[in-house]
Amino acid sequence: MSTKIRYGLGLLMPFLFLLALCPTVLAEDGRAWTWLSSNDKYSKFYAPASVRVTSSVAGAGGSVATEITGEIKTGFSYEGADETIRNYKIGHVIQNPGQLSYAVAQVRVSPQKRTLQYTGETFYDAAGHVLWSKGEGTEKEMNSQQFDEEFYAAIVDMVFHRGELARLRADDRWILLWSDEMASGVKTQVTADTSTMRRVRDNLVFWAWTEVRNADGKVVEIKFDKRAVNLPQGTERIVTGKYWSSAGGWQPLEDGYEGAYRMIARGTPEERGLVRLRAFADGYSTWVTRYQIP
């Protein structure tokens, strides 16, 4: 088989999976679903007509939504269904992953907290028969490691039209704060996720990704943390996060300052990051203050 044919089939298979899924969902529940993304395990959709503002407060320019509800759908390939069944620990209910076709869920979103919470979820087979249902889930903050991040962005965009989904997909979503290489060849690089950035008074709050590579270029440490940087004072603190090493895998991030602010010293690589953050906050002030309430 030629390279071109193999490549063409590789592109065609996810598309055929999507085509096979969409008519079934539309025929069974009558909703108009909008496609968000697909990979070899999952296809994500949301129902624009289902989006409702359920709570708001008065702001300077009018009411500001503080709670939004909507419906989302996830389509499963065999591999995606198998992974989902294991994650939900429902193998005793759905024993054959081939049965699980898609799930429809009701979610509640808070734009100010950047959170999404499932209020109900139902799993179906290809004929639309219910396989399993669950009630309210845990409220989760959205970031690059969350499966539901695109759902959150699409629902918020339906109300505010501020480009949440576009920022998730932008080439410059992650910006370099600083990088530094030691004489031994060990290199550290820190990037910031602009899609998560919010300015709360003097603090710029966001999620950051730190990678440490050895002289051979192999990743030996990763930190993924939410941090608050006081821009005028030049201090920062870690709010929460996790840490990975080749020896220990992923672990909760232990911050030696126990959540307290620490000074960003002058002349350090971290100071370059502070300068970058100040420039971003000034240049994109409308973005970092979106959805704020008095």
Residue ranges: model-predicted function:
Residues 23:
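Cys/His-rich metal-coordination motifs, chiefly Zn-binding "fingers/knuckles"
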Residues 10-20:
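Bacterial N-terminal signal peptides
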Residues 27-105, 109-294:
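N-terminal secretory-pathway/extracellular module detecting exported/lumenal segments
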Residues 1-8:
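N-terminal secretory signal peptides that target proteins for export/translocation
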